[in-house]
Amino acid sequence: MHIRNSAKAIIIQGEKVLLTKNQDTDGYFYLFPGGGQEHGETIQQALIRECMEEVGQQVEIGELLHIREYIGKNHEYASADVDVHQVEYYFISKIVNETKGNIEPTNPDSHQVEIEWVPINDLSEYRVYPKTLRKYIIKYLKGVKSPVYLGDIN
């Protein structure tokens, strides 16, 4: 199996972060908008495309905050993700010229049911993946430096 690159957006407005709300057999779970890099596009081009699909908004990409690996065989969904090895690049991003009213995805993933602004202080109450990233976002907002490379975390 090959290693897949993925770009993710950390979009913060005020005290909230924008996440995709998804559903599986265990209920709702939340992910940072973004997805896989396609052949011939840069990681930033992938993020712009994926945000348009999942959030329906143009984003401006800022600082690369974290790089996280996900080696599926090492985590809770190992039986389903045994062949998955993904490198994810998390960028601070912002919505450019946000349209008024509801933000709607243009081409959501099959498990995505909507998008939601989640209070950052309540992130621990949500089933957010990767779980470990929640604490790093809170540290970032407090001005606390964290490593860029986080390793194989979930």
What are these regions (language model features)?
Residues 38-60, 71-128:
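Unchanged
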Residues 1-18, 36-39, 88-92:
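Conserved N-terminal beta-strand and adjoining loop/helix that marks the start
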Residues 19-20, 104:
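Beta-strand scaffold of nucleotide-dependent catalytic cores
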Residues 26-29, 76:
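A short local loop/turn or secondary-structure capping micro-motif enriched for an aromatic residue
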Residues 28-30, 101-154:
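Nudix hydrolase/Nudix homology domain
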